[in-house]
Amino acid sequence: MYRISSFKRSAPQLTLGSIALAAVTLTCVYFQAHFAAAAFAYLLVVLLFSLMGSFIASSALCIVAIAALAYYFAPPAFSLRIDDPRDVPVVVAFLIVSVVGTYLIGKLRQEREAARVAAAKLQRSASDLEDREKRWRAIFEHNPAMYFMVDEAGIVLNVNTLGATQLGFACAELLGQSVLDVFLEEDRAFVRKCIQTCLEDVGQSRTWDVRKVRKDGSVLWVRENAKAMLWAGDRPVILMACEDITERKQTELALQRSEAHLAHAQELSHTGSFSWNASTGEAFWSKETFRIFQIDLQTTPAPQLVIERTHPDDRASVKEIIDEAMRDLRDFEHEYRLLLPDGSVKHIHAQARVTRTASGEIEFVGAATDITAARRAEQQLRRSEAYLAEAQHLTHTGSWSWDVHTRDFVYRSAEVDRLFGFNPQEPVSLETIRSRIHPEDLPGLQEVQRQAIDQEHERFEYDFRVILPDGGIRRIHSVAHVVVGSDGNVSELIGTHMDVTEQHAARERLENTLVALRESEQRFRDYAETASDWLWETGPDHRVTHLSEHTSAAGILATGLTGLLRWDIACDMEEEPEKWRQHRATLQAHLPFRDLIYRTVNRMGSPIYVRTSGKPFFDGNGNFLGYRGVSTDITATIRADQAEQELRKAQAELAHVTRVTTLGEMTTSIAHEITQPLAAILSNADACLGWMARDVPNLAAARSSVEWIIEDAIRASEVIRSIRALAKKGEIEMVPLDINQVVRDVSALVTRELVSHQVTLRSELASALPRVLGDRIQLQQVIINLVMNGIEAMDAVTDRPRELLIQSSTDDLGYVQLSVTDCGVGIAENDADRVLDPFFTTKSSGLGMGLSICRSIVEVHGGRISVVQKNGPGATFQFALPLHKEAIS
């Protein structure tokens, strides 16, 4: 076979080689090549073509080449004879090299052919082995599991493509690496221990769940099935088949997180879940349900436990609802109370739905929510509403809202009905209300409202009278403002009605008192001009023996007093017996006395007050002869003191009425300050129920809503406390006060007034001010009066910002000083000295008593109030109060 193949190759080799030699010959002849160069060219052709065929063909080409070399290039030309002896070695060398070269090449070709045949056989064997390996590799690669083969040191010997690609590697990247590198670092010790267990029990399968780490750092869960076996040379290896259980684990973890979140949500929202199989009686309670009912977690839940924990007053209704739900197989929802072992009470809202299990059994699934906090918030809300109603009742102020289009009330508080003499519980028509308004006042009231609507007055006021069913007259002062709708037109009027009957009566009483006071002052002045002291003398028996003639001439004392005892002419024996007992004891002891004051009557029978002092006198032997002394008619002084007390009382009543009136004028602000937190409480309570009613309650939002409810309730309570304090009529209570805190309290009350008048309040309060001794309510009244005056003074200001400045400081004399500065129209120079006087006012309405009352209050506190001239527009009122003694020390 080899010879035939060699012969087949010799013919084309010889033919092509001859053609090549001819071409080389022509080329060398053409270029007149040297003998040696031609020999080298022929040698290359012979050796080149010896690669194609047999040694015989190569030898033939060699002979042809020598003949051509001798014939064409060795002299003589065209002859086979070689004359030049120098060419003979070249020919010999050519022959040796070509023969040896072709032989070696032929030998090499034989060896290559033998190697090729052997390789073909080996290739066929390898192909068979490869086919078998491919079949096993296909099984290994296409198995839907990750396969690893590792040695006893944990080095990866083999891994299928799925095992590598699942981890984001190429197979070559894992071979030779430690299998522990593909496991999560926290799990490597566990895997090492599992591999060691497999090596200890060769042939025994082991299974475990563990986490692996992909090349990109992501984690997947796998279930490892591993078994150790003996490999070549009895060397142990571990075969590991891995199943990806990431989704299953994620589902399990998600379920665990969901259960944990549900448990936290139930704990935060105080909502427990439960289920109850109506057929088997089996029940399930969540942990929060056990906590709500305060029952041990080890206790088997049952409906009877609910009945036992239920408040005795609610037990019958709860049992009835459960029985009806069982009988009719229907959903149920109800609220009831729990009476816990510690005596506390909880309010529970429970609801359940009827479902069917996979086996078709009836089961109730529901939730029980602890709504105790919500119930308490509702109670607080109702209390706040009651506080608002009480505040309006105390100040005799009602609030209302009037729809301009329907020309009827949208809202009116119960106090409005009371002001008109109606029962708030009974419906009242608009015509009935109008019938109570005094006929003389109704047209004017309607005209004021019409002008406010037409001219869109932001704020307007008016007064009218109400005729009560008993015929009495109640005077009402109303403050209101317009509300502009989205269409730019007035849609609503909102305002307040204030009962100022007491204020009006107090004003009349004050005017009458002032008239009487002037008459009394004139009368006392006449008394003072005509009265004088007189001398008197009594005997040993203390009877009057002598009076100066002036008393009779002036008619100071009644006639016929001689011979009477002093207590016989006194008119206050029964009123002050102790005073007279002590005086008689002094006389019996013959001791001097001073400034005994008693009441008697003058010649006209009118009561007078006498102040007398006396001294005993004796004869030369020391015998007691009686008393001599001097008396003074102090009726004018006593009556002046009494008049001053009456005046102070009238001023106190006027101050109280002014406070109440100020509160009435600020009712819109106060109502806003109270209704704003009340509305927030309602909104937050509604939001809380909404958060709780979701399929998955939003506990964080519900908790925030409850916290906001508490904050708003506290804010409303603080506002009402301040209103009650200002409206209260009581004695002056002098206590150490922080004047800055008093300013802050007032700022909270007048916030709405500032907003409605577009006034900005700026406070510059000195820090660490010493305390003053004063009555909080009266000082609040002073500051409110100054602030309200400042606000009203800026109503006409349109060319600059309306700003009110309150400053506190200490002056050089050690007084705490407070000033209120506005940027209004200011005070005329000729009015500055009179602005603090009673009944002086620059307003179109009012008595002019506000600043006078402020001065009286400040002076009672030992302070002073004044008007400070300022360069710019507006006015500054300033008052200073002495420090509290403890602050001085």
From Swiss-Prot:
Domain PAS: 132-202, 384-456
Domain named PAC: residues: 206-257, 332-383, 460-512, 594-646
Alphabetic keyword roster: ATP-binding, Cell inner membrane, Cell membrane, Kinase, Membrane, Nodulation, Nucleotide-binding, Phosphoprotein, Repeat, Transferase, Transmembrane, Transmembrane helix, Two-component regulatory system
Membrane topology term: Multi-pass membrane protein
Protein name as catalogued: Nodulation protein V
Annotated transmembrane regions: 16-36, 37-57, 60-80, 88-108, 155-175
Compartment list: Cell inner membrane
Catalytic activity, EC: 2.7.13.3
Function according to Swiss-Prot or TrEMBL: Member of the two-component regulatory system NodV/NodW probably involved in the regulation of the transcription of genes involved in the nodulation process. NodV may function as a membrane-associated protein kinase that phosphorylates NodW in response to environmental signals.
Reaction catalysis annotation: ATP + protein L-histidine = ADP + protein N-phospho-L-histidine
Gene transcribed to yield this protein: nodV
SUPFAM superfamilies: ATPase domain of HSP90 chaperone/DNA topoisomerase II/histidine kinase, Homodimeric domain of signal transducing histidine kinase, PYP-like sensor domain (PAS domain)
Residue ranges of every copy of the Histidine kinase domain listed in the record: 669-885
Any GO MF annotation of the entry: histidine phosphotransfer kinase activity
Main location: membrane
GO cellular component, one term: plasma membrane
Origin organism lineage: Bacteria, Pseudomonadati, Pseudomonadota, Alphaproteobacteria, Hyphomicrobiales
Gene Ontology biological process: phosphorelay signal transduction system; regulation of DNA-templated transcription
UniProt organism field: Bradyrhizobium diazoefficiens (strain JCM 10833 / BCRC 13528 / IAM 13628 / NBRC 14792 / USDA 110)
